[in-house]
């Protein structure tokens, strides 16, 4: 059953009360604990349902999908089932971008992904077959199939797939439904004062600026141009 969660509203006064060298650290620990508890609950559900062979993690850009998939994989492994983590980002098509009506490169549409290759490899993995997973280079927009990316999943293993379109009909909808579990996540909090000061999408935007700079060779202005406030 889907659990949509509840929007968390934090006032500027409440946040200010929790600032300080010791208070801020405590707030971070409490937030991390709540996050890990939710991940552990999902891991328990996936690990003890032996029909589940794949968990698909989806959500809007910069929601924490990669971090969550890593933590979830570790938690499932602790319950005795090995995992294989796959990022849909490695299935981008090679070559130039498509552009939207404003002339900005489109990296959000599902048409930018090689769905045929993706679904074919996922089906093979769920059948216990071996594949060579792709690796996409965002700097050169090229895709390779290095030998060290050869992979398979054991009979009791769980495949963890993270990406923007992981829960789309074109992806998870093409796979055996009784073997797949879906997880949708998104920062779901607002900072409020006399008015809303920081919305969930702005939190994600700050995360994306940091990620694009570190992992996609993209500056902050380019990110803001692509994803304006």
Tell me what each language-model feature is.
Residues 74-84:
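Post-Walker A helix-loop "phosphate-sensing" segment adjacent to the P-loop in P-loop NTPases
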Residues 65:
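Conserved lysine of the Walker
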Residues 155, 161-213, 229:
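ATP-dependent NMP and nucleoside kinases share a basic, alpha-helical "lid"
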Residues 84-87, 93-144, 158:
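Conserved nucleotide-sensing/catalytic segment adjacent to the nucleotide-binding pocket
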Residues 55-57:
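Hydrophobic anchor at the beta1->P-loop junction of P-loop NTPases
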Residues 1-44:
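Charged, amphipathic alpha-helical linker segments immediately N-terminal to NTP-binding catalytic cores
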Residues 62:
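Walker A (P-loop) phosphate-binding loop of P-loop NTPases
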């Amino acid at each position: 059953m889907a659990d949509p969660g509840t929007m968390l509203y934090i006032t500027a006064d409440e946040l200010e009360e929790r600032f300080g060298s010791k208070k801020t650290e405590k707030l971070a620990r409490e937030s991390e604990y709540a996050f890990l508890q939710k991940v552990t609950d999902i891991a328990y559900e996936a690990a003890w349902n032996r029909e589940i062979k794949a968990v698909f993690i989806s959500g809007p850009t910069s929601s924490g999908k990669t971090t969550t998939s890593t933590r979830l994989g570790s938690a499932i492994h602790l319950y005795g089932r090995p995992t294989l983590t796959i990022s849909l980002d490695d299935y981008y098509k090679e070559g130039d971008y498509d552009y939207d009506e404003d002339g900005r490169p489109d990296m959000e549409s599902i048409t930018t992904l090689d769905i045929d290759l993706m679904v074919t490899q996922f089906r093979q993995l769920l059948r216990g077959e071996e594949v060579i997973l792709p690796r996409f280079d965002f700097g050169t927009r090229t895709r390779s199939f290095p030998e060290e990316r050869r992979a398979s999943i054991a009979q009791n293993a769980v495949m963890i797939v993270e990406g923007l379109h992981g829960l789309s009909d074109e992806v998870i909808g093409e796979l055996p439904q009784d073997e797949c579990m879906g997880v949708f996540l998104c920062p779901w909090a607002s900072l409020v004062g006399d008015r809303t000061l920081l919305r969930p999408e702005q939190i994600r935007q700050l995360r994306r600026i940091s990620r694009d700079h570190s992992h996609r060779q993209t500056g902050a202005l380019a990110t803001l141009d692509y994803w304006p406030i």
